Amino acid sequence: MDPRSEVLLRQAELFQGPLLIAGAPADDLLGQLPQAQAWTWHAGDQAMLESRFAGRSHYGVEAPEAAFDSAVLFLPKSRELAAYLLNALASRLAGRELYLVGEKRGGIEGAAKQLQAFGKPRKLDSARHCQLWQVTIDQAPQAKPLESLAERFELALEDGPLQVVSLPGVFSHGRLDRGTALLLKHLDGLPGGHMLDFGCGAGVLGATLKRRYPQSRVTLLDVDAFAVAASRLTLAANGLEGEVISGDGIDAAPTELSLILSNPPFHTGVHTNYQASENLLKKSAVHLRKGGEMRLVANSFLRYQPLIEGALGNCQVRDEADGFRIYQATRG
């Protein structure tokens, strides 16, 4: 069980009524708290929670409409995302209790100061390198629309400026990361057909593909509901059409793809997790059509080339700069 869940269960008597658990991990916490509902923005966690606790978990960027008497937020990595989530929860809890739980190395002590906007926070427990905080909502805020927190910026690309809309919690929020910047220089000569932007984030790569290859069908895929929402906003801001889907890794992707393009993720919260990226490399052949291509950027220290060669039988390094490599491989 997640150590943060264990800290909650040390105070289980506080959580016996209708409770919303925001950012709920995919463990047995719902099984221990029978009146609780979960809210998650991670498609993999949602799939596991729904399979074990059918009808008790909500996936999306907005809190479920169902009533709750109190709520607990599992602290996310992004401080801006935490602020949005705390505001969304506090706006529904006037005079009632809001809890915040997180790991010390995830910044729980600093994040707890964000509770001061709603009342007088107090620390209830500290165990398993985690802390649990509580505040009674004396000053319930107005709920802020998610789009009001969007960061909008423009990228100067070869074929004209691209408008990017990013949301709190999305990878490289509000700026272009170095890996994607390098990959954007290597989008020439791609095979047309059905293209996939895997781990799409704010949709920079997918939007660029659709603009550069307008006759191709472009699908954007991410595990995170906020990334899915941001990608849709980015496409709309540029007058582009594309299919944006949520799913847990490459298994959720279409097959018979002409292209997989990716700056694959390797962080889950504050933890490093290479599973999604390694699955992408190992299973790429299942999703590419014959002659289809995979092109991706990754940190130079990651040993991805043997995995790509094992799946597709070939792999070349197109470029290396600034600590990143561009890999290219074709399904024979």
From Swiss-Prot:
Secretion signal, residue range per the UniProt entry: none
Name of the protein in its database record: Ribosomal RNA small subunit methyltransferase C
GO cellular component: cytoplasm
Organism from which the protein derives: Pseudomonas putida (strain ATCC 47054 / DSM 6125 / CFBP 8728 / NCIMB 11950 / KT2440)
EC annotation from Swiss-Prot or TrEMBL: 2.1.1.172
Self-association state and partner proteins as the record states: Monomer.
Sorted UniProt keywords: Cytoplasm, Methyltransferase, rRNA processing, S-adenosyl-L-methionine, Transferase
Methyltransferase in keyword set: yes
Catalysed reactions, as listed in the record: guanosine(1207) in 16S rRNA + S-adenosyl-L-methionine = N(2)-methylguanosine(1207) in 16S rRNA + S-adenosyl-L-homocysteine + H(+)
Recorded GO MF terms: 16S rRNA (guanine(1207)-N(2))-methyltransferase activity; nucleic acid binding
The family this protein is said to belong to: Belongs to the methyltransferase superfamily. RsmC family.
Parts of the chain that traverse the membrane: none
Superkingdom of this protein's organism: Bacteria
